[in-house]
Amino acid sequence: MSDTPLIQPANVGEGVYEEGREGYGHIKSYVRRAGRMSSAQENYYAEMMPKIGLVYASQPIDLAAFFGRNNPKVLEIGTGMGETTAKIADANRDIDYLGVEVHVPGVGALCKQIAERELTNLRICQHDAVEVVRDMLPEDSLDGVHVFFPDPWHKARHNKRRLIQSPFVALLASRLKPGGYFHCATDWEEYAHQMLEVLSGEPTLVNSSEGFAPRPDYRPLTKFENRGLRLGHGVWDVIFRKKQLA
């Protein structure tokens, strides 16, 4: 691994730079938003997280042992309020999904979805995604990575806080199995082009399309996406695969 931080440090006043394991740190790509869980979310959180929560630790985990089976594993970074994540897991119960989300109301909402849908193939880690990937996920352990609608940090001075940057993409690619896929989606066109450029620059990945990809059936439209499409707004999908071993 190079000495390049996983996400570039921000300027003074833009965030706190945190040292990581072995000195590889990163600037947080999110801001902890104020928000409270509803009473229902609190109840589901208290009931479900001891059962399906992955507690952060600075050591690699055995994903097959954690899920109790050796099925394909997909990491989803940023589950939001959980509806899309739960729909994907519900439609693909032969695939195990690990959702990583820092915002408590979103985690509570996803716990509710997991309980109501009786999902056994979806688990949650409430922690910073960069640290989870860096410290807990072994190399060649994932069959797929989802990064759907990450914060675009649209102001130029905040672009360095974007999640999709070359060092983090290289780290994620190292966790993918050969043939595994890396799927990003955004409704911010300038960020979409950055995603395409960054993933194209990762030597272990190859584009599955000749540019942007059509939305695959496994990614359902969100209510915000549907509204945006009705208003003529665009959404861009970027899907790469890890090169097979020679």
UniProtKB/Swiss-Prot annotation:
Q: Which pathway, metabolic or otherwise, does it act in?
A: tRNA modification; N(7)-methylguanine-tRNA biosynthesis
Which segments carry the region annotation Interaction with RNA?
157-162
- Protein keywords: Methyltransferase, S-adenosyl-L-methionine, Transferase, tRNA processing
Q: Which Pfam families does this entry report, sorted A to Z?
A: Methyltransf_4
Where along the chain is the active site annotated? D151
InterPro entries linked to this entry: SAM-dependent_MTases_sf, tRNA_(Gua-N-7)_MeTrfase_Trmb, tRNA_methyltr_TrmB_bact
Catalytic activity reads:
guanosine(46) in tRNA + S-adenosyl-L-methionine = N(7)-methylguanosine(46) in tRNA + S-adenosyl-L-homocysteine
Q: What does this protein do?
A: Catalyzes the formation of N(7)-methylguanine at position 46 (m7G46) in tRNA.
According to UniProt, the name of this protein is tRNA (guanine-N(7)-)-methyltransferase
- List the source organism: Dechloromonas aromatica (strain RCB)
